[in-house]
Design a protein with these regions (language model features):
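Single conserved hydrophobic/aromatic residue that forms the stacking wall/gate
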Residues: 2-12
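Compact structured core domains
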Residues: 23-98
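Short, Lys/Arg-enriched anionic-surface-contact patches
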Residues: 84-107, 153-161
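Short alpha-helical "packing" element that flanks the helix-turn-helix/winged-helix DNA-binding module
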Residues: 106-113, 122
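Short alpha-helical "recognition helix" segments of helix-turn-helix
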Residues: 119-126
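Key DNA-contacting residues within the recognition helix of helix-turn-helix
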Residues: 134-135
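Short, Lys/Arg-enriched C-terminal cap helix and immediately downstream tail that follows
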Residues: 141-156
Length: 164
């Protein structure tokens, strides 16, 4: 079957395959977090040292595609890769757990602060007190998500050799 072009990816019979080459760890992380939040995507992250061709990077990412929705499989394709792939995948597994336990109210609250609102602005937008906003963020695991996001960013940056 020949794929039909659809902009970001290729669509095959009953299966979507979206591929994106990103130049930095933060862009990759933001994309993965959006897909994890949705919960319906099997995600593959291929990390190379940047010395290979675009085709090699695409092949690495394709090999990394997970088999289950809400899962991130990671392959680090470089000379000195040790446990980096497993560490990154474990970080995403923990963050996915936090994201999937969120209530509607928790998703609403975290979405506003993720977009740059402070807690007071987000509370006003939702029509709740700042104390209620703080409680929603705590119940939603916002501090854990922030810590996990920073950890994932650090690990991906190191694995890509960008922090060296």
């Amino acid at each position: 079957d020949q794929p039909r072009s659809r902009g970001l990816g290729d669509v095959y019979k009953r299966q979507e395959d979206i591929r994106s080459k990103v130049e930095d760890a933060e862009a990759a992380l933001n994309l993965i977090m959006a897909l994890l939040s949705d919960g319906n995507w099997a995600i593959g992250l291929g990390i190379s040292d940047g010395e290979g061709s675009t085709r090699d990077a695409s092949a690495t990412a394709t090999k990394a595609v997970g088999t289950r929705a809400g899962q991130v499989r990671v392959i680090v394709d470089r000379q000195q890769a040790t446990t980096e792939a497993a560490d990154i995948a474990a970080t995403f597994a923990l963050m996915a757990h936090v994201l999937h336990k969120r209530t509607y109210e928790g998703r609403e609250a975290t979405s506003l602060v993720r977009r740059g609102m402070n807690q007071n602005e987000a509370a006003a937008t939702l029509g709740i007190s700042k104390q209620a906003m703080s409680q929603r963020l705590q119940a939603a695991g916002w501090p854990a998500e922030q810590a996990g996001w920073q950890l994932a960013l650090n690990l991906i940056t190191r694995a890509a050799g960008q922090g060296e």
